[in-house]
Amino acid sequence: MESFGRAIVIPERLMDAASATAGSSPAFVFMFIEALADGAVAAGMPRAQAYEFDAAAVAGSAQLVLETGRHPGDLKDMVCSPGGTTIEGVRVLEEGAFRASVMNAISACVEKAKAL
């Protein structure tokens, strides 16, 4: 059952949510990597190098969540130095409703799945 990846058994009532978050999130992650790279390119980094840096950062961050079992918010807080560049970027993302936009996208996917 796991020849193509990890199998997780869930109740049928969670199928739409699982489909939305597991099935659609790769596209959102690709968009995030692309946006990170676009920002780096705007700052002068070559695109290929930006993709390499940003894809590695996303992969490493995801691996930390899986390996440590720590809450993603705790991990975020660990890399935000007081008054530093990362917390400034987090502030800007929050001003732009980053989390709300992601949550709304998942909700839209769930509603679409229910309609199919």
Per-region residue spans from a language model:
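Alpha-helical membrane segments and immediately flanking helix-loop junctions
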Residues: T21
